[in-house]
Amino acid sequence: MDPNTVSSFQVDCFLWHVRKRVADQELGDAPFLDRLRRDQKSLRGRGSTLGLDIETATRAGKQIVERILKEESDEALKMTMASVPASRYLTDMTLEEMSRDWSMLIPKQKVAGPLCIRMDQAIMDKNIILKANFSVIFDRLETLILLRAFTEEGAIVGEISPLPSLPGHTAEDVKNAVGVLIGGLEWNDNTVRVSETLQRFAWRSSNENGRPPLTPKQKREMAGTIRSEV
């Protein structure tokens, strides 16, 4: 087994333990707690795959971190923090487009993980573009603020938004939700394209026809769920 794989797992286990102690003292906010739960599941899976005991790995991770901290100067820590890139906020929509109220003649709604998908199934034979406002870090989508579907006339006919009760989502969550929304709109013979900005940072690529490169799994989910649920 690669020793770097083992040491990475050990450090991750110890850092999770530290974050758990922070949560136990009621110092973590909702996104912090959400990531804590997600990472716990991930560590259990990694431990099972690697055949490593989490408690033993946590102790070993503590020793690694303590050794690094002894060697770390305050100046080096400041330089490390300064070199971490900050999130960027990208906007496809204007403030008016984001805040505008809209209604649906035939409303449909689906919850996909931590995201809520809404669309008007009365819309047919329209050209539709999906626009989104979101944050980016390391040139990848970090957090979706809001996504809306617009007709050429500017009418809002669909939306994807984070659920306040389930904070925290991944780029994969967003891509899956976009796939469901596209499938629902295309079911009524609409032509849907995704903004170049969203394609670039969510899928790391773009197509001239505005369609993101959905995986076979996403295409199956679109076809299987949209008929009955959206």
Swiss-Prot record:
Any GO BP annotation: symbiont-mediated suppression of host type I interferon-mediated signaling pathway
Quaternary context: Homodimer. Interacts with host TRIM25 (via coiled coil); this interaction specifically inhibits TRIM25 multimerization and TRIM25-mediated RIGI CARD ubiquitination. Interacts with human EIF2AK2/PKR, CPSF4, IVNS1ABP and PABPN1.
Full protein name: Non-structural protein 1
Span of the annotated motif Nuclear localization signal: 34-38
Documented effect of changing E97A: Complete loss of inhibition of RIGI CARD ubiquitination
Domain commentary: The dsRNA-binding region is required for suppression of RNA silencing.
Subcellular location: Host nucleus; Host cytoplasm
Cross-link Glycyl lysine isopeptide (Lys-Gly) (interchain with G-Cter in ISG15): residue positions: K20, K41, K108, K110, K126, K217, K219
Biased composition annotated in UniProt, kind: Basic and acidic residues: 218-230
Region (Disordered): 205-230
Chain intervals for the UniProt region annotation (RNA-binding and homodimerization): 1-73
InterPro entries per the UniProt record, alphabetical: NS1 (IPR004208), NS1A (IPR000256), NS1A_effect_dom-like_sf (IPR038064), uS15_NS1_RNA-bd_sf (IPR009068)
Phenotype when changing E96A: Complete loss of inhibition of RIGI CARD ubiquitination
Signal peptide positions (record): none
GO molecular function terms listed in the Swiss-Prot or TrEMBL record: identical protein binding; protein serine/threonine kinase inhibitor activity; RNA binding
Residue ranges that the Swiss-Prot or TrEMBL entry lists as coiled coil: none
Organism, as annotated: Influenza A virus (strain A/Puerto Rico/8/1934 H1N1)
Any one Gene Ontology cellular component term annotated for this protein: host cell nucleus
